[in-house]
């Protein structure tokens, strides 16, 4: 108890005797500040533990946090130099964004002249039929208020008209006048109540909500508010507070808070940062060189990381399946459950391997080996070299990552571990690379106004240099008010890019969500505009995590990031959270990963706090945990010591709660000094990619968005779409012996012009039949016959169920609306040709299925009159894995004889080539019709269309995706052998 009293008294003494500390606590947690003012304390241990955590956090990391730290800009020079003069540290105070948001809400709620207020539609709202949906809300943190996950409002004609008219900002008075033009009998009072309801549900937003792409959102807001006494008073008190010297601002701060609370009372009305305007700090060019080398090393090993965008990749595969490679889809339509693919966040995390899969496996294997050796030899450090890393790539015969695919820019965080500046200049230092962002300069965005014009100019140059690396794309600054509006403090900065997308300030924004379209290539998604000419890159000049963004913003941010090979901090892969001890990892003078310890909480759950402390100290001694260490959680670091009773209590409490701990060695930084002593410094360097490595030029064919009226064929159109669910084993039997006879029976009474089928799984296995009906009045007759025969099929155990559905024609995939009828006619005759072949296979048990399938593919391509090289090019479009060639030798000789024989008219009538050609002849008229209508399509595009047709042909033959890939590769290789041996001219 005596020890506990000692540390509590020490913490309280610090608070009572240090005005700057009290001021910093008031800014960080005013509720804690108020609790400490009331003596005696109600719960001294709990209150002082909270206070101790702030002290620990201040000593742990130089993260800008109120008055616990400050920011400044430095320079590179021949040697390191500099010291701190704390009299040159200045505050910058501005209204917290949460307070600004609350002020706007109050103004709209209490304004007597409601009709003068500006409003705008919320671009995140979706209109579906007669309902409005909103899934992203802005809120002020309040435990009493529960934020809804989704709002759904009935939208009558008035609501829809209001929503559409307010897509451009206008006053409620102007909105009323426009409404009267189309709805002249409106009641004004009732209409205004509707507008108020839409504002309260965030369907409409206040038109004065300030832009976050600004030096001062508060000044922007003041332009819209009527002049009031409190404004001048607030401006004066802000100025007074900022001008007080450090250590004498507590009273001024409290007066300022009272004034702000009188206007809008919230928990944190003020946002304070500190900046240093003394003599700059200079770091040596040698340090920069070491950082560049370490970054190159880190980027190479980042190739071992599997993609973090695996849900996005699953979404992309579904996009290709539904829309193909030649269609762009409006962003908002894509995210719609009804029109597109729905939310990409609901798609599974697929097991997507790294692009550098061999290296990834080798890296993890070698890292494991080095860890085992370090444990065996009791080593506290592992040293890696560039030569060793390059040898791993050589060992697995993989090329080094392409620097053109690297990020255009990024910020690197690092610390310098050294005893003094003199030691740094002697080369006695180490650099700890702690973190990075994926956009250069983003760390500095929120501090823009704290830098001098020279530094601001350098940051502007960085944005321009980044644009030069992306010559074929528009780089767009994306901005939005986050759901927890206090986080908007991180997002305040001017726009340094030519284009912007502000979803809450459309009048200030060059682009809107409705302007964006999504397409995909074989490798990745891309964002474009309606004309499809230029790619759009969605970037952000701040460090607010895009994970918190509205889904539409998150999607475009992930699409932009997924085009790059990203940079990651060092990661121990499977060992990161499992190994009890991980040694320090170093490359030259750069610490890539400090020593780490993992402590599993499961063995402490039943123990008392006192026993947990004893067990922890024993564990710490066994695993040689230093006296001072960091407890980490994400990017939060807390400096602790095993000798401090409050720290031990914090550790024991967490373990008792079942929280496993990750501990890390402290990287000390004592060389940066002032008259008050040593200071912890964390440095951030923005990097821009070398201009000799621009991002690869976009080779995709521009796709303009087309609204195709004939894309959808609903029940009742000329196409009847029937799905028959059944087991895979029954498919051919049902197709040949049940469904085709059913169609033949129908044709005795009515005219079914054409039909075709596709095999599918979504996830249940089924056959899809599309029937083109001459007279839609036959629909009822067909269904009346389908019902009894369907019941019979179900009773026989042949099928599970039958469904009618809407047929979405894949217009872009097959060359456009002009050729779609010809494509469907070809599908119909191909269905007849394939079913003929399948019947032949049924009778000939000795037929080699693989050979027949390959010959059928070749005969399909022969029908277009393609030469040998063009056939090879079509099959090569599929980008197959060469490993699948295994087994080709078994068929090689037979294929080299049979493929040329397909074009020999003198083949035996019962021979396999004659049989394949017999059914191929059914397709020839339809193929010729397609060619006559497709003359306007360029050759490279035609090859892709042929490839898609081959995919559908293989599907009808009964091949799944892996079988099709293998068939294509065998076929391509056989054709290359034929070309080589001149069997076909």
Enumerate the predicted regions with their spans.
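Long, contiguous binding/interaction regions
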Residues: 695-766, 770-985
């Amino acid at each position: 108890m005596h020890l506990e009293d000692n540390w509590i008294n020490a913490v309280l003494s610090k608070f009572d005797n240090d005005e700057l500390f009290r001021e910093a606590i008031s800014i960080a947690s005013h509720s804690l500040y108020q609790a400490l003012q009331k003596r005696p304390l109600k719960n001294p241990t709990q209150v002082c533990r909270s206070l101790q955590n702030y002290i620990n956090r201040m000593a742990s990391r130089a993260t800008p946090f109120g008055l616990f730290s400050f920011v400044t800009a430095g320079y590179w020079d021949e040697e390191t130099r500099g010291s701190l003069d704390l009299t040159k540290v200045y505050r910058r105070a501005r209204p917290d964004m949460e307070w600004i948001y609350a002020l706007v809400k109050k103004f709209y709620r209490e304004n007597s002249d409601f009709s003068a207020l500006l409003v705008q539609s919320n671009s995140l709202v979706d209109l579906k039929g007669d309902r409005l949906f909103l899934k992203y809300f802005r809120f002020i943190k309040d435990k009493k208020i529960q934020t809804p996950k989704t709002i759904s409002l009935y939208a009558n004609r008035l609501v829809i008209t209001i929503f559409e008219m307010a897509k451009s900002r206008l006053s409620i008075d102007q909105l009323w006048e426009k409404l009267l033009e189309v709805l002249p009998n409106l009641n004004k009072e009732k209409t205004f109540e509707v507008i108020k309801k839409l504002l309260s549900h965030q369907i409409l937003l206040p038109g004065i909500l300030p832009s976050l792409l600004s030096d001062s959102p508060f000044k922007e807001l003041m332009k819209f508010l009527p002049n009031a006494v409190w404004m001048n008073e607030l401006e004066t008190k802000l100025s007074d507070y900022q001008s007080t010297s450090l250590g004498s601002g507590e009273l001024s701060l409290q007066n300022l808070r009272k004034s702000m609370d009188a206007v809008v009372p919230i928990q944190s009305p003020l946002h304070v940062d500190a900046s240093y305007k003394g003599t700059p700090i200079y770091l040596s060019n040698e340090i920069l060189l070491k950082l560049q080398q370490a970054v190159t090393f880190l980027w190479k090993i980042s190739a071992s990381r599997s993609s973090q965008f695996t849900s996005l990749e699953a979404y992309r595969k579904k996009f290709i399946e539904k829309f193909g490679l030649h269609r762009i889809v409006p962003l908002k339509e894509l995210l719609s459950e009804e029109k597109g693919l729905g939310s990409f966040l609901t798609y599974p995390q697929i097991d997507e391997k790294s692009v550098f899969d061999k290296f990834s496996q080798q890296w993890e294997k070698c890292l494991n080996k080095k860890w085992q050796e370090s444990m065996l030899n009791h080593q506290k450090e592992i040293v890696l070299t560039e030569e060793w890393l390059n040898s791993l790539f050589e060992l697995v015969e993989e090329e080094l990552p392409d620097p053109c695919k690297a990020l255009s820019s990024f910020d690197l965080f690092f610390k310098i571990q050294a005893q003094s500046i003199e030691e740094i200049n002697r080369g006695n230092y180490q650099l700890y690379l702690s973190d990075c962002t994926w956009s250069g300069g983003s760390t500095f965005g929120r501090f823009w106004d704290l830098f001098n014009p020279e530094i601001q100019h350098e940051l502007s140059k960085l944005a321009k240099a980044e644009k030069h690396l992306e010559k074929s794309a528009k780089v767009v600054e994306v901005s939005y008010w986050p759901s927890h509006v206090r986080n908007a403090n991180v997002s305040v900065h001017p726009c340094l890019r030519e284009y912007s997308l502000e979803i809450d300030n459309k009048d200030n924004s060059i682009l809107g969500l409705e302007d964006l379209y999504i397409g995909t290539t074989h490798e990745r998604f891309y964002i474009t505009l309606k004309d499809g000419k230029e790619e759009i890159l969605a970037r952000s000049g701040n460090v607010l995590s895009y994970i918190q963004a509205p889904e539409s913003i998150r999607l475009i941010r992930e699409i932009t990031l997924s085009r790059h090979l990203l940079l990651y901090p060092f990661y121990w892969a499977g060992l990161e959270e499992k190994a009890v001890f991980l040694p320090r990892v170093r490359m030259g003078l750069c610490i890539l990963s400090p020593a780490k310890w993992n402590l599993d909480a499961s063995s402490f759950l039943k123990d008392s706090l006192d026993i947990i402390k004893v067990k922890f100290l024993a564990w710490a001694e066994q695993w040689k945990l230093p006296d001072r260490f960091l407890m980490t959680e994400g990017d939060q670091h807390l400096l602790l010591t095993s000798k401090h009773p409050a720290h031990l209590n914090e550790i024991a409490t967490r373990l008792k709660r079942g929280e496993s701990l990750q501990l890390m060695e402290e990287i000390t930084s004592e060389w940066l000094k002032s008259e008050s002593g040593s200071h912890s410094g964390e440095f951030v360097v923005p990097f821009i990619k070398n201009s000799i490595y621009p991002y690869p030029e976009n080779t995709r064919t521009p796709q303009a968005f087309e609204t195709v009226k004939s894309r959808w064929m609903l029940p009742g159109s000329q196409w009847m779409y029937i799905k028959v669910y059944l087991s895979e084993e029954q498919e051919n039997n049902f197709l040949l012996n049940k469904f085709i006879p059913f169609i033949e029976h129908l044709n005795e009474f009515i005219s079914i012009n054409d039909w075709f089928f596709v095999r599918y799984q979504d996830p249940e296995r089924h056959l899809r039949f599309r029937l083109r009906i001459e007279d839609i009045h036959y629909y009822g007759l067909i269904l009346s016959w389908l019902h009894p025969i369907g019941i019979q099929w179900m009773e026989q155990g042949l099928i599970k169920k039958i469904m009618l559905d809407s047929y979405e024609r894949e217009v872009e995939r097959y060359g456009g609306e002009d050729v779609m009828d010809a494509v469907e006619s070809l599908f119909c005759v191909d269905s007849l040709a394939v079913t003929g072949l399948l019947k032949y296979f049924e009778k000939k048990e000795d037929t080699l299925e693989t050979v027949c399938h390959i010959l059928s593919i070749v005969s399909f391509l022969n029908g277009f009159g393609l030469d040998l090289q063009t056939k090879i090019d079509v099959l090569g479009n599929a980008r197959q894995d060469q490993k699948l060639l295994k087994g080709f030798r078994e068929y090689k000789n037979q294929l080299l004889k049979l493929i040329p024989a397909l074009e020999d008219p003198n083949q035996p009538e019962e021979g396999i080539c004659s049989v394949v050609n017999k059914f191929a002849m059914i397709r020839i008229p339809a193929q010729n019709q397609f060619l006559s209508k497709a003359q306007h399509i360029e050759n490279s595009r035609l090859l892709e269309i042929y490839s898609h047709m081959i995919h559908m042909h293989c599907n009808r033959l009964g091949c799944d995706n892996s079988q099709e890939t293998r068939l294509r590769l065998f076929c391509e290789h056989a054709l290359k052998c034929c070309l080589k041996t001149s069997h076909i001219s």
